[in-house]
Amino acid sequence: MIKRAAAAAIGGALAVAAVPAVLGAVGFTGAGIAASSLAAKMMSAAAVANGGGVAAGSLVATLQSVGAAGLSTSSNILLGSIGSAFGALLGGAKRASPSPPPGGPRPEGEQPGENVPQVEPPKSPLGPEKHEK
C-alpha cells in the first residue's frame, strides 16, 4: 500500500513538473517563443493559415500563454490528480512471474515425457515404397 501511495505522489509531481519542462523544450518560454524552435514554426504556420495573425484561443496561443504564465491552480490540481492516478496504477501493477526455462527445474513428481502421449507415426497409405534401378 505504501508503494502504491509513493508511486501516486511521484506520478502527480512528475505530471505537474513535466508540462513547463516540455513546453520550454519545444520553445514556449516565459520570455515568449524562442527563435528557430518548433514553437516558432508552429506560430509561423498558424499565422500563414490565418492570414497573418494567430487566432485567439488556438493551440499556439494557448501553449504560448501556458509557457509564459504557467498553468492555473485548477489545471495543476487536475493534472496532478491524473498523474497520481496513473502513478498508482503503474505502482500497484503486479508483474507476471517469469516461467521456468524449458530445461529448468520441474515440480516434484513430474518427469520429462511423463505427460506426453506416446503415439506411433502415421503409416503411409500407399504402402512401402519400392525403388527401381
Swiss-Prot record:
Keywords: Apoptosis, Membrane, Mitochondrion, Transmembrane, Transmembrane helix. The keyword ATP-binding does not apply. It is found in: Mitochondrion membrane. InterPro entries: IFI6/IFI27-like (IPR009311), IFI6/IFI27-like_sf (IPR038213). GO terms for cellular component: mitochondrial membrane. The chain crosses the membrane at residues 8-28, 51-71, 73-93. One of its GO terms (biological process) is intrinsic apoptotic signaling pathway. It is a multi-pass membrane protein. It holds the Pfam family Ifi-6-16. Residues 93-133 are annotated as: Disordered. Its main location: mitochondrion. One of its GO terms (molecular function) is molecular adaptor activity. Plays a role in the apoptotic process and has a pro-apoptotic activity. Belongs to the IFI6/IFI27 family. This is Interferon alpha-inducible protein 27-like protein 2. It comes from Bos taurus. The lineage of its organism: Eukaryota, Metazoa, Chordata, Craniata, Vertebrata.
